[in-house]
Amino acid sequence: MLLTFLGTSSGTPTRSRNVTSIALQLPQRSSLWLFDCGEGTQHQVLRTPLRLSQLEKVFFTHLHGDHLFGLVGLLASRALGSAGTTPVKLYGPPGLQEYVRATLRYSDTHINYPIHFQTVEPGLVLSEEGFTVLANALKHRISAFGYSVIEHDQPGRFDAERAAQLGIPFGPLYGQLKAGRTVALPDGRTVDGRTLVGPERKGRKLTYCSDTIYTPSAIELALGADVLIHEATYCEADLNLAERGLHSTAAMAARVAREAKVRQLILTHFSPRYEAGLAALRTEAEAIFPNVRMAEDFWRYEIKAVEAQLPKALVEQ
């Protein structure tokens, strides 16, 4: 699971940060998912290896402009590219479909591929081969949702090298061993396939929460996540601004990470008032939760799977 941060500023762009958008590339799939699509996102994509022709889904946390205004231009550019008639599905709060249809109509923009819409509610958003997406309501000035992308658990890895060392002939026997069965070899030995297949690999979990002030629903959504991406618009010194706008401080985001027992916290959605530096935000977050990274535009982050150890192979003579 590979993340590319396309925009990490809140409200307005700065010289070094565009407004919010995050790209997600999933393993063994050529599709691209976006989370939010602020103004200028398509320009950001042009400066990365990403391709709009691979865009499959866009998930919107809420409908404020710094998360939305880049969508229609991006869809229009995709229609002029090599995507053909491959559809795009848009997920978001009520009003998303009305906004997109009206903007396309009044700008006389024609899209040559299907656009599908799904209004998001707390709970299951989708479940398809390999992945499930869940949503939960956040606490912001308008309807807002956080998302969790959960990879389904994977079968354990088959150790073909060890099988070869044991003199097991390559062929149909490998399929039986991969399935964890005990097989008889031509020389009379038996091999327990379970000892050549690692433990089931737990799927990875990514949670994204923005925009929101501290809320228990974010903790519920992020519980046990490998990576939590959480907005950190302000530092605690500007708590009054966070409370007024229903945004999070870096300390609030760190509390969510700690209470949800996540592995890694990535902060994003920084107010332009901190353009000179984010040291204060990082310091206050690390005082609560040590594994903190500060997102930057075009930064790529891989969520790596945790590999389990194989047991010792059991071979009976």
Swiss-Prot record:
Reactions the enzyme catalyzes: Endonucleolytic cleavage of RNA, removing extra 3' nucleotides from tRNA precursor, generating 3' termini of tRNAs. A 3'-hydroxy group is left at the tRNA terminus and a 5'-phosphoryl group is left at the trailer molecule
UniProt: Zn(2+) 1 binding residues: 62, 64, 140, 211
UniProt key word Calcium: no
Active site: 66 (proton acceptor)
UniProt keywords, alphabetically: Endonuclease, Hydrolase, Metal-binding, Nuclease, tRNA processing, Zinc
Cofactor binding remark: Binds 2 Zn(2+) ions.
EC number, as in UniProt: 3.1.26.11
Binding residues annotated for Zn(2+) 2, in chain numbering: 66-67, 211, 269
Pfam families per UniProt: Lactamase_B_2 (PF12706)
A GO term, aspect molecular function: 3'-tRNA processing endoribonuclease activity
The protein's required cofactors: Zn(2+)
Top-level enzyme category: hydrolase
Family: Belongs to the RNase Z family.
Assembly description: Homodimer.
HAMAP family cross-referenced by the UniProt entry: RNase_Z_BN (MF_01818)
Function: Zinc phosphodiesterase, which displays some tRNA 3'-processing endonuclease activity. Probably involved in tRNA maturation, by removing a 3'-trailer from precursor tRNA.
Name by which UniProt lists this protein: Ribonuclease Z
Organism: Gloeobacter violaceus (strain ATCC 29082 / PCC 7421)
